[in-house]
């Protein structure tokens, strides 16, 4: 293996959405260095943090249509049975909601929790409350996806937080998504809610760490044995 290949395999890729921010941090660091050298080194540390924030590592996603995979890196902040947001069009019957909160040190690339077809994308403007608060699901700016899966329609909602002020969603209505596939990103601290129909059983606990594209957060039916994974 060549040196270039070794470095490429060792370093975690940075998502292209972060290039502009990294460049801004770097240039500002150089300018600050002209005023006072220690400021430049502080700026370089912040530049390194920015690159770390926008990291986009590969993940090994379990292949099983009965499994629901975490859509985000972070901490499971809530597991509850609630009425889904009206804009999703999922009806008024309560659904299982599993929430994953991302702090500013978590990877913020969002991934599809199940394979299926995107039937609806609904954006709603709102506040920028702390995303860990339960009322953030209703009050904060959010972008919701309805994905038709083999177990029925599920909802995936990207929620802006106290620091996050930009929700990005790259998929489109009628597009097909594979479980673990990247579909969006939220900048600088946020939350993702997954709404699941009857039959889904949670496989995580509140406070547990979840890894996007890898951690099984819920399941339809019972486990059938060893998992098979694919790189995503």
Curated annotation (Swiss-Prot):
It is an enzyme of class 4 (lyase). Keywords: Cell membrane, Decarboxylase, Lipid biosynthesis, Lipid metabolism, Lyase, Membrane, Phospholipid biosynthesis, Phospholipid metabolism, Pyruvate, Zymogen. One of its GO terms (cellular component) is plasma membrane. Coiled coil: none annotated. Pathway: Phospholipid metabolism; phosphatidylethanolamine biosynthesis; phosphatidylethanolamine from CDP-diacylglycerol: step 2/2. One of its GO terms (biological process) is phosphatidylethanolamine biosynthetic process. Its EC number is 4.1.1.65. The record marks 189-190 as: Cleavage (non-hydrolytic). It catalyses: a 1,2-diacyl-sn-glycero-3-phospho-L-serine + H(+) = a 1,2-diacyl-sn-glycero-3-phosphoethanolamine + CO2. Catalyzes the formation of phosphatidylethanolamine (PtdEtn) from phosphatidylserine (PtdSer). HAMAP family: PS_decarb_PSD_A (MF_00664). Belongs to the phosphatidylserine decarboxylase family. PSD-A subfamily. This is Phosphatidylserine decarboxylase proenzyme. The lineage of its organism: Bacteria, Pseudomonadati, Pseudomonadota, Alphaproteobacteria, Hyphomicrobiales.
